[in-house]
Amino acid sequence: MTQDLLERLQAARNFSAPRVFRRMHEEAAEEGLPALGDRVRWWSLKRIARWQPPADWRAASDAVPFAQTSDGDLWCWYPSWATGNTPPVVLVRASEEARLYAPNFEGFLFRQLLDWLSGVPGAALDCDEAELESRARTAVDSVRPHLRSNWLALLDAVRERPLRRNERSGHLQFLEPEEVREIVQRELPFDRLNPGLLQVG
């Protein structure tokens, strides 16, 4: 069934989903898709294949949404900016042009975890830090089969740090957003990359 839907996606959108995404969906029946919170609400393969750009769409016509944020902004593959056969991932907000988030889908998963660890969403002042540490471990483990070993080592090291309260946002965090930007610029090089695109809804 999953393979049929992936083939339908390729036929409908003239687009072949990245290998990591295909494997993720093939394994999802047993493990479920990676839990990335409100930042990433995964679309079904059927919805991806059926999507058509709205009248006010300002991004490239070959963009392929695969998920959305809690605010309805779309995470899309963007073949127009592809390097070889590798489409980058962009964020498209309503009536806005695309903002590049990661040079590939694997980098998208990696950066999502960095963003999550830099400001745990919904953390009240009296929250249980042990619970948040457990959630961080679960979040990293959910992408473990899909990321390269050096990125996993970095994420594991970050989630082992003590939680700190960000004085400006009030969020608990394992690392500062400024450190995320440095990691993104080092690990996800791409001419159009927007390293300041953090803490999306």
Report the location of each language-model feature.
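A surface-exposed partner-binding patch
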Residues: M1-G84, S142-G201
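Short alpha-helical interface elements
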Residues: P34, L91, L114, A130-E133
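Alpha-helix N-cap recognition
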Residues: S44, P103-L109, R135, N150
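Compact, glycine/acidic-enriched structural inserts
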Residues: P87-A124
